[in-house]
Structure formats: structure tokens, C-alpha cells
């Protein structure tokens, strides 16, 4: 049995302004005309645009996510940090965790804390896994992925709210 449902995740990175949100109209039109009603689209704009994008896609199947989050779930004096509560209150449905551009500054234990924080607030997680070029060249792919998944999912009881992105 094959699963023909696809999930398209648009990570805007550090791009986009409020004026760019109107471009989502093309996606909404495409979804309405699409024969496969099970495909899913998730937009992950910069934090500053999450609520605006969420407002734009209300009454559609399109979901909205954040590009990262703090491992800390509490409020406090953490300049520049965004926790899962703030993402949820802005309208986020998903959060990207462990993206390669950030993973090199974090370890698997921090990734695990972020996953726990996101799931606690009922956010779905897009867990990015993958090896570096050097690890691939040294035939370490399997061991790296195994480590990232094993430590990243430590004490996670259910993985049905986690999407793995490689």
C-alpha cells in the first residue's frame, strides 16, 4: 500500500514582508482546483508574519508554522527567544526543529527539549534530520540519523504529531 499524500512545507527563512502575503492567493486557488484533497501545505514564515499568514489562510486547509523555537517553555528575560506558547498564540500549528542551518549550533539534547516544549503546547513538529557532507563522505549517515532520532525523540510517547524531514 502506498501513501500518495504529500506534505509541502514552505520555509520562508528570513524572507518576506507583509506585502508578500498576497502571493498565497495562488496557492489557495491551486488547492481549490486540485484533485488530490489530501495533500497538505504548511507555510513557515518569519515569526513576525505568523499571525498575518494565519489570518490569510483561515477557512483553508493551509497550516502555518514557525521556523524554530526556544527550548525554554516559560516566559522570562530571554531576549530574542520565542517559546512554543508564543508560537501557539500567534496562530502557529507547526514548528520546524533541527533545521541544518540551526542544528550545527545545537545538540540533540536541545532538539529533544524543543520537541517536548512544542508538543506540550499542542504544536506539531517538523523534525529535520540529516548528516553533514563530511559525515556522508565517511559513511556515517545511518549512525548520525539513528542518533538524531533516538536522542531527539527520547521520552516522546507518541510520534503521530511529528513529521520527519530529511
Predicted regions and their residues:
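Active-site loop-to-helix "anion-binding N-cap" substructures in soluble metabolic enzymes
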Residues: 1-166
Amino acid at each position: 500500500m502506498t501513501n500518495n499524500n504529500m506534505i509541502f512545507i514552505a520555509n520562508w527563512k528570513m524572507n518576506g514582508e507583509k506585502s508578500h502575503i498576497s502571493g498565497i492567493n495562488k496557492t489557495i486557488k491551486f488547492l481549490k482546483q486540485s484533485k488530490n484533497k489530501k495533500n497538505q501545505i504548511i507555510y513557515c514564515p518569519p515569526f513576525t508574519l505568523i499571525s498575518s499568514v494565519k489570518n490569510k489562510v483561515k477557512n483553508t486547509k493551509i497550516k502555518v508554522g514557525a521556523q524554530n523555537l526556544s527550548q525554554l517553555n516559560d516566559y522570562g528575560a530571554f531576549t530574542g527567544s520565542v517559546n512554543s506558547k508564543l508560537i501557539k498564540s500567534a496562530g502557529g500549528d507547526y514548528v520546524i526543529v533541527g533545521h541544518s542551518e540551526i542544528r550545527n549550533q545545537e545538540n540533540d539534547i536541545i532538539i529533544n527539549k524543543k520537541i517536548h516544549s512544542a508538543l506540550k503546547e499542542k504544536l506539531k513538529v517538523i523534525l529535520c534530520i540529516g548528516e553533514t557532507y563530511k559525515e556522508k563522505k565517511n559513511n556515517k549517515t545511518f549512525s548520525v540519523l539513528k542518533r538524531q532520532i533516538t536522542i531527539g525523540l527520547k521520552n516522546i510517547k507518541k510520534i503521530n504529531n511529528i513529521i520527519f524531514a530529511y
